[in-house]
Amino acid sequence: FIPHMKSQKNGKIAVISSIASFRGLPHHSAYSGSKAAVRNICQGWQSALKKHRVSVTAVCPGFIKSEMTDSNNFYMPFLMNTDVAANKIIRAVDRRKKVYIFPWQMRLLAIPILKYAPDWIINKFSL
């Protein structure tokens, strides 16, 4: 699909990463690490595809109600319904956002904590 978008000089790609991509998380390092890799790949694609007018949006959601989160046995703040999440993602992709972090509470609160909190705080609250 990318060669077609490049030849058309237009396209939009959405790739699902996660809020967890902003820090290696204890007991979830494979998940957070793989999601960080996804976000970094998107950055490379953004640069490579910009001249072809193909945008790439790295979508970094918080918790979304799904089969995966149904099995979680911990508190999931700002848990979002799938339809609401899908509509937010569509809107971000249409606006050609490079990185879309949602819900807004996670963007404002969780990201600074994940990026800058000392390890002992992250370890204290990790599962």
Features from the language model and the residues they span:
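C-terminal helical subdomain
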Residues: 58, 74-111
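Active-site-adjacent segment of SDR/Rossmann-fold oxidoreductases
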Residues: 23, 44-55
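Short, flexible catalytic-loop segment of classical short-chain dehydrogenase/reductase
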Residues: 61-71, 75
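Active-site loop immediately N-terminal to the catalytic Tyr-X3-Lys motif
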Residues: 25-29
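Residue(s) in the substrate-gating loop at a strand-loop-helix junction
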Residues: 18
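Hydrophobic structural elements of the Rossmann-like NAD(P)H-binding subdomain
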Residues: 14, 56-59, 69, 89
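Amphipathic alpha-helical dimer-interface segment in Rossmann-like NAD(P)H-dependent oxidoreductases
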Residues: 1-7, 46-47
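Active-site helix of classical SDR
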Residues: 34
